[in-house]
Amino acid sequence: MNIYLDYIQEIEDRKAQGLNPKPIDGAELVSVLINQIKDVNNQYRDESLNFFIYNVLPGTTSAASVKAKFLKEIILGESLVAEITSEFAFEQLSHMKGGPSIKVLLDIALGSNETIARNATDVLKTQVFLYESDTSRLKNAFEQGNKYAKELIESYANAEFFTKLPEIEEEIDVVTFIAGVGDISTDLLSPGGDAHSRSDRELHGQCLFEHNKEMQKALSALQEKHPGKRVMLIAEKGTMGVGSSRMSGVNNVALWTGVQASPYVPFINIAPVIAGTNGISPIFLTTVGVTGGIGIDLQNWVKQKDADGNTIVDKDGEPVLKQEYSVETGTVLTINTKTKKLYNGGKELKDISTALTPQKMEFIKAGGSYAVVFGKKLQTFAAKVLGVTAPQVYAASKEISIDGQGLTAVEKIFNKNAVGNTPGKVLHAGSDVRVEVNIVGSQDTTGLMTSQELEMMA
């Protein structure tokens, strides 16, 4: 009980900072919530229900493990909660990514109760974050003749978790917001001095634009003025996202301008739209892909050339630029994902096909690159179990091979571990194929944020 009252006190303290209750990642607090939910006369029951449903972090957090077990009790009829039906319990499990929620769903799908096994199987068909313990269990059940295991593996082999997702909108309306002129560092988006708060996403969100409240208010006002449109954050006459705080920087931009990933998980947003006159920093652009976002190279200012093709400079030695089109704050633009062009009304401004490659379109559709990577792995597993060739669902591999050119150390590692590429073909930089990986290293981590990313990826 004390831990719950401590949480209530923390909520009051956060209110003074303009913050909502902090998402729960610990098992002990969730256990207290469950006890209070079970006690229909408990004075804290209503708010405990709300916290349990809408404020528990997913994945492999200890909180998610306790939540998943209680949802299983509800589905099996071992616990009765009027506000959480069996259907609603399945709905919540479907949003918990992987780890304990997958174990619970497999327990039910491979169990003896036909009705709920059917429901669990239908939910599992939408999931991609299965690990070796999960797939091994599924394979064993398949070999023992379990019909739902067979149905699941056939679904995974056809990658129905991807093919049955909603198609990407043909037109995405955005309204521009110039975050700065010149290169924009990740420090503007996620200052290094605020690194301590990066795992508390709502708190960290307050440091966007280096705590510039006027800019934050202007961004919010723009959103209120243009409901239904996404805000596109822009580096005018520069490159967006230079610097090293790429993940927390993208998290902050997504928090302010993106889409909530799940109604049951607060302050985790995806799909930000960002742009720069000179494009996006490569590692920042990759991280945008992790969240299923869009990064656009605007080229709305171009360097002027003289008759000999040399860049014209001003008295300060800076290149003279000519504006090709305006993206001043408040400009409404349309991203067409079919034509892969950027429009202002009916006027075509720019070909943006590099922002909407087949691979990047997959990330957008799946809600991020992790889901695509795990999905490909799951499809490969299922096809292997069935002894069939996996159908071509994802974008075809891109193989770049340059005759007579040697390999860098990284290219050698890449070639040694490539999967499904043309046999005997040597691949060079720019290739996009599957590789087998069993070790992941990082040269730069920020403690809690990194562990949180891993837990919520499940």
Show the residue positions of the predicted features.
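Generic amphipathic, hydrophobic interface segment in small proteins and small subunits
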Residues: 34-51
